[in-house]
Amino acid sequence: MSLHLVIIDALNLIRRVHSAQPDPNDITRTAETTTRTLQRIINEAQPSHMIAVFDHHLSDRGWRAELLPTYKANRKPMPDVLQQGIDAIQDAWWQLGIDSLLSEGDEADDLVATLACKVAAHQEKVTIISTDKGYCQLLSPTLQIRDYFQQRWLDEPFIAQEFGVTPAQLTDYWGLTGVSSSQIPGVAGIGPKAAKEILNQFSSIEEAYASPELPAKYRKKLDPHIEMARICKQVSALKTDIELGFNLQDIRFNSSSAD
């Protein structure tokens, strides 16, 4: 069997399932629903290796908030009842044969990105299960992102249609436009249309900033805010060099556990 690593963005999945439950206090039902969801994902993906990555609920906003104090400053905390039920959900997933990785100081996104890129760099297949478009900056011939809830692939054609740039330009795009859901401001006065025009003409923020060909209407917006653009790009970029402390053999998926 060829290697296929499936990485679950755990809280991304759990929060969406939990928010759709008729009784938010019924964590048993949330656990059962997420387990059925994972069973369907397993049946579709046929993974050889699988892991669920969790943000540690006590972790702060990390290095990104040090660079950009507004980063996720207004994000709603996890509901207490759900936070208290995470262990039960992890236990249910363990019964399926899926181990959990909890972040300790790093955001789950960076752990997912590091693991995915390490495996994809060896030309092995990786699927990230998440609705988070931030992972699309990682896209490669062997690394794909699946939005399970919309039943769609967040692939290059999707990125081209959604943003009008390439996956490699996404962090530059967000450096210009910002990301409202994470309180990343971007450059004042540069929205999606302007960012697309700039990045269709230039490969990056730095190339645009250095070029005498940058149109004056964008120059007057970018020049006073170039440092903010750089910070927003850096905050939008996922880290791929975290020490993980385990190897692939540790997360080999035993399909008999999911039967």
Swiss-Prot record:
GO molecular function annotations of the record: 5'-3' exonuclease activity; 5'-flap endonuclease activity; DNA binding; magnesium ion binding; potassium ion binding
Protein name: Flap endonuclease Xni
Keywords on record: DNA-binding, Endonuclease, Hydrolase, Magnesium, Metal-binding, Nuclease, Potassium
Binding residue positions for Mg(2+): 109
Species whose genome carries this gene: Vibrio cholerae serotype O1 (strain ATCC 39315 / El Tor Inaba N16961)
SUPFAM superfamilies per record: 5' to 3' exonuclease, C-terminal subdomain, PIN domain-like
Organismal lineage: Bacteria, Pseudomonadati, Pseudomonadota, Gammaproteobacteria, Vibrionales
Database matches in HAMAP family: Xni
Region (Interaction with DNA), start-end ranges: 189-194
Keyword Zinc-finger: no
Amino acids binding K(+): 176, 185, 187, 190
GO BP annotation list: DNA replication, Okazaki fragment processing
Ranges of residues in domain 5'-3' exonuclease: 165-255
Function: Has flap endonuclease activity. During DNA replication, flap endonucleases cleave the 5'-overhanging flap structure that is generated by displacement synthesis when DNA polymerase encounters the 5'-end of a downstream Okazaki fragment.
The keyword Ion transport appears for this protein: no
EC number: 3.1.-.-
Family: Belongs to the Xni family.
Note accompanying the cofactor annotation: Binds 2 Mg(2+) per subunit. Only one magnesium ion has a direct interaction with the protein, the other interactions are indirect. Binds 1 K(+) per subunit. The potassium ion strongly increases the affinity for DNA.
Matches recorded under PANTHER family: 5'-3' EXONUCLEASE FAMILY PROTEIN, FLAP ENDONUCLEASE XNI
Obligatory cofactor(s): Mg(2+); K(+)
